[in-house]
Amino acid sequence: MHKLLKLAAMGTAACALLAGMAPVANAQEKQNVEVLHWWTSGGEASALEVLKKDLESKGISWTDMPVAGGGGTEAMTVLRARVTAGNAPTAVQMLGFDIRDWAEQGALGNLDTVASKEGWEKVIPAPLQEFAKYDGHWIAAPVNIHSTNWMWINKAALDKAGGKEPTNWDELIALLDNFKAQGITPIAHGGQPWQDATIFDAVVLSFGPDFYKKAFIDLDPEALGSDTMKQAFDRMSKLRTYVDDNFSGRDWNLASAMVIEGKAGVQFMGDWAKGEFLKAGKKPGEDFVCMRYPGTQGAVTFNSDMFAMFKVSEDKVPAQLEMASAIESPAFQSAFNVVKGSAPARTDVPDTAFDACGKKAIADVKEANSKGTLLGSMAHGYANPAAVKNAIYDVVTRQFNGQLSSEDAVKELVVAVEAAK
């Protein structure tokens, strides 16, 4: 009944939602899209300007609806409230299973026309298509491929530690100990559940892509309750000892700033963090180092920002299709992702304009896609539905904060996931 109410609210909102959005041919009135997103940090906002300007050049005005919060949780809360109130946005930045949830309600538009014409099927990796399509139809336009198993290291601090990038767990711990001896915070981290889970993503992946897939994508109880999972929690406990006392509630971009300013040695974060370094005028290889979390080389846990369009009347569809087409154009994919810090959602975009970290990201995604190790990120909504993700978040955060032992965390993880399925 709740879903029906949502859809009814959307139906009544369709006309009012995009009022004033006339065809391009009507010079007196621009087409318009109202866009809900959570790209509010410096680097992210700069990237968003690329899309705004691209659409404006095509005669489509942009009404901005930003909601702060790096994981998108707050944005989805606002979206639910807007839809319930009968006032849904035109286009919404979404991740993974959130897209499927709205598609199952029949709330999203159909992008097949533009997708077929432009051959999206051939150039967008299959793991992304699992979320950009529903029941055989394109429902969302992937903007990028962010990978989450990155480390962002202050170059000066690394040089003081000998300059060697860690390739395994023991070398990572030795580096963190060195950072501590230098008098800086070893790990810049924000104590928010999605950030805790981002680290856990990488830690679990370091035990191998097969284990990660069994645990977080297949939700295999044996993997979730295994000794390997206990080892992963043990490593989280160890990493917790390298975080400063003021980490609770810190936004991710403020943690990035700690590394940028030399106050911390490393941040474990997706490649959206690179946008913060670039915004601060820092250069890869000179001021900071980007590398995969030790033990995850050759595999990529991804999330992909996508824009899903809500159903509107036929006269409003051209603007939505124009926006989708603009998002998937190779020129935009390059320009946007160079600024955003991510890899293009298309595999045919040249890496010419990208910096060293960007070139590595593109190469890593291609390698992982060909090897079957391009895996949806648990922490960012591409491994399992929101209920399961949130159940995992709860256990991971409590364990990271010392409220659960590793043994108890493993037991609770199995129970929590089973209950949330």
Swiss-Prot record:
Keyword match Transport: yes
Origin superkingdom: Bacteria
Location of this chain's protein in the cell: Periplasm
Family matches, as InterPro entries: Bact_solute-bd_prot1, SBP
Keywords: Periplasm, Signal, Sugar transport, Transport
Span of the signal peptide: 1-27
Coiled coil: none
Family membership: Belongs to the bacterial solute-binding protein 1 family.
Protein task: Part of a binding-protein-dependent transport system for a sugar.
Listed name of the protein: Probable sugar-binding periplasmic protein
